[in-house]
Each structure stands twice: as structure tokens, then as C-alpha cells.
Amino acid sequence: MSITPEKKAEIIKRFARHEGDTGSPEVQIAILTERIKNLTEHIKKNKKDLHSRRGLIGMVNKRRKLLNYLKRTDFERYQKIIQELNIREATGSR
């Protein structure tokens, strides 16, 4: 259900702006996206796992907030990460 340290390091290396960057919005969004994919698969198999479903909703909301922040501050990087991660553009006025 969680991502392996090797997979996490690979994601950080791919999306980091500079050496040792683990906190930039791009890295956080990429890690959350991987966790969301894994948890979605878990929920497909375990439909009654409401605790995990609530965690999934929280992760999706956090990713949406990070995407909105990135969209406000640097639209080019926002478009690039949306394309690379193959996720839909955030819509709505929240």
C-alpha cells in the first residue's frame, strides 16, 4: 500500500529542482500521486475499507491544494507536472 524507499528516491530524483530537494511542490505532488495510485488499487480490492478511503480523500485534497499553489506561482511548472504525471487539470473554485 505504501511506496518503497527505492521508488520514493526515484521520484525525488526525477522531480527535484536541485540536489537534495524533497520539499518542492513538484516532488510532493509526484509522491502523493504515487501513493494515491497505490491506495486506489487497494480500495478497489477492499471496498469496505472506509479508513483507507478517508485517507485517500485527504491525499487527493492535499495534492489539489499543492497543484493550485503551483498553478498560482509558476504556471509553466504546473503544466509540465500535469503532463508528466498524466493527471487531470484541477478545476473548480475551491
UniProtKB/Swiss-Prot annotation:
One of its GO terms (molecular function) is structural constituent of ribosome. GO terms for cellular component: cytosolic small ribosomal subunit. GO terms for biological process: translation. It comes from the Bacteria. CDD domains: Ribosomal_S15p_S13e (cd00353). Keywords: Ribonucleoprotein, Ribosomal protein, RNA-binding, rRNA-binding. It holds the Pfam family Ribosomal_S15. The keyword rRNA-binding applies. One of the primary rRNA binding proteins, it binds directly to 16S rRNA where it helps nucleate assembly of the platform of the 30S subunit by binding and bridging several RNA helices of the 16S rRNA. Part of the 30S ribosomal subunit. Forms a bridge to the 50S subunit in the 70S ribosome, contacting the 23S rRNA. Belongs to the universal ribosomal protein uS15 family. This is Small ribosomal subunit protein uS15. The gene is rpsO.
